[in-house]
Swiss-Prot record:
This is Phosphopantetheine adenylyltransferase. Pathway: Cofactor biosynthesis; coenzyme A biosynthesis; CoA from (R)-pantothenate: step 4/5. InterPro entries: Cyt_trans-like, PPAT, Rossmann-like_a/b/a_fold. Transmembrane segments: none annotated. GO terms for biological process: coenzyme A biosynthetic process. It catalyses: (R)-4'-phosphopantetheine + ATP + H(+) = 3'-dephospho-CoA + diphosphate. ATP binds at T10, F11, H18, G88, L89, R90, E98, Y123, S124, Y125, V126, S127, G128, T129. The record marks H18 as: Transition state stabilizer. The gene is coaD. Reversibly transfers an adenylyl group from ATP to 4'-phosphopantetheine, yielding dephospho-CoA (dPCoA) and pyrophosphate. It comes from the Bacteria.
Length: 159
């Protein structure tokens, strides 16, 4: 039986880079749980429930489950019987931070391993922060996010 992975993030919003990481990781795992985390920003662009629902609507593979992340990531992983944490790396600059997180998670729960997948070249510059900035300034985000997410962001902007 293939293992279960947790793919954590704020996904505010879900980008094509996130989707690419999940699609490339699916052959490695029996199941991937996308753990949508609350954001530390006082005013998230999308509410947690909105993000969870959008992600679930975009990622329709039965091996993908989308849940709100509660508590410590390693505790969440144990609760859902996951033995891997999946992380995407866009650039070398991501590695230092992710490496520290991986070691901290290992200290908290050595039975849970962190797996890194590098972003494909076409996605290495895409970030939720940049997408939010483009939305705020009235730009077109359709090259960077799934069509469903682009439509949702456009509707929110028109309100």
């Amino acid at each position: 039986m293939k293992p279960i992975a947790i793919y954590p993030g704020t996904f505010d919003p879900l980008t094509n880079g996130h989707v690419d990481i999940i699609e490339r990781a699916l052959p490695l795992f029996n199941k991937i749980i996308v753990a949508c985390a609350p954001t530390s920003r006082k005013d998230p662009h999308l509410k947690l429930e909105e993000r969870v629902n959008l992600i679930a609507d975009v990622l329709t593979d039965e091996r993908v489950e989308v849940l709100p992340l509660t508590g410590l990531l390693v505790d969440f992983a144990k609760t859902h019987q996951a033995n891997f944490i999946l992380r995407g790396l866009r650039a070398v600059s991501d590695f230092d931070y992710e490496f520290q997180l991986a070691h901290m998670n290992y200290q908290l729960s050595p039975e849970i391993e962190t797996i890194f997948l590098p972003a494909r070249e076409g996605y290495s510059y895409v970030s939720g922060t940049m997408v939010r900035e483009i939305v705020t300034l009235g730009g077109d985000v359709s090259p960077f996010v799934p069509p469903l997410v682009a439509r949702h962001l456009q509707k929110r902007r028109e309100k």
